[in-house]
């Protein structure tokens, strides 16, 4: 059996980020072979992942960014189990490394993002590696992207909230774009305008509105009218262009964009 030196343990720790005792044990099992020791650590990570599969990963980092030309934007959610890990500098750095790959490679979906290379390893495998290092279940649970003439991103302090927005003209004022993306982060609209709301959602809102009106003793025909009135309220609360602007509730976001465009309307895409 090979002698495991402290310098070897430190070297493996620097290579992998794993704990000192984990590295020593891995090198012992691998008889001093660094490549095999890395595999041992990876296998440990896989075991941790399986062991913790029934535990939720509800904390984490929600982050977004854009390419340097502001033509593309991406948003990801990397979950962990505890707030302690979510605030860990290495965890946040790892999340940003995944985001940077998403921006550079522009994958079609989450599955494709997970298959991309990060430091010579597929992102999905690197997540497994990090599970072994960190000791918590990690999950890349969400990925979204936007491509447009001008894309802006926003990350709320603490990495718990983020948003991206695309505009169909490149000459939009940066402050206007920032205001809109912060509106999205704050008010969480389900669509850009009324016409973008799925019919299934509209039908559900009308049905709920009618049921509420009937429970209040309204006749069927009156309940229908009341439901449509409530639907208009739903549009104002849930569609971006019809929401009240959080910085000036006398304006909707649509009106704010029109006023800012000086006759040349800028639309969110």
Describe every region a protein language model picked out.
Residues 2-269:
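N-terminal assembly/interaction segments in proteins that build large macromolecular machines
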């Amino acid at each position: 059996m090979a002698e495991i030196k402290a310098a070897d343990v430190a070297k493996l720790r620097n290579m992998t980020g794993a704990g000192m005792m984990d590295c020593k044990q891995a090198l012992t099992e691998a008889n001093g072979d660094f490549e095999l020791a890395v595999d041992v650590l990876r296998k440990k990570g896989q075991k941790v992942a399986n062991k913790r599969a029934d535990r939720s990963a509800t904390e984490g980092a929600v982050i977004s960014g854009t390419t340097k030309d502001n033509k593309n934007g991406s948003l990801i959610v990397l979950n962990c189990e505890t707030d302690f890990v979510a605030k860990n500098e290495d965890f946040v750095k790892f999340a940003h490394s995944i985001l940077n790959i998403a921006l550079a490679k522009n994958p079609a979906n989450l599955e494709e993002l997970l298959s991309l290379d990060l430091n010579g390893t597929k992102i999905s495998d690197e997540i497994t590696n990090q599970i072994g290092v960190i000791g918590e279940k990690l999950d890349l649970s969400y990925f979204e992207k936007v491509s447009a003439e001008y894309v802006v991103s926003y990350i709320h302090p603490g990495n718990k909230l983020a948003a991206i927005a695309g505009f169909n003209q490149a000459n939009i004022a940066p402050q206007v774009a920032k205001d809109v993306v912060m509106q999205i982060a704050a008010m969480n609209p389900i669509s850009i305008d009324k016409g973008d709301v799925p019919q299934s959602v509209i039908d559900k809102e009308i049905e709920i509105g009618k049921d509420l009106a009937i429970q209040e003793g309204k006749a069927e025909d009156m309940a229908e009218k009341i439901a449509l009135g409530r639907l208009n309220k739903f549009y104002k609360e849930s569609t971006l262009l019809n929401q009240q602007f959080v910085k000036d509730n006398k304006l909707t976001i649509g009106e704010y964009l029109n006023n800012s465009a000086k006759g040349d309307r800028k639309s969110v895409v």
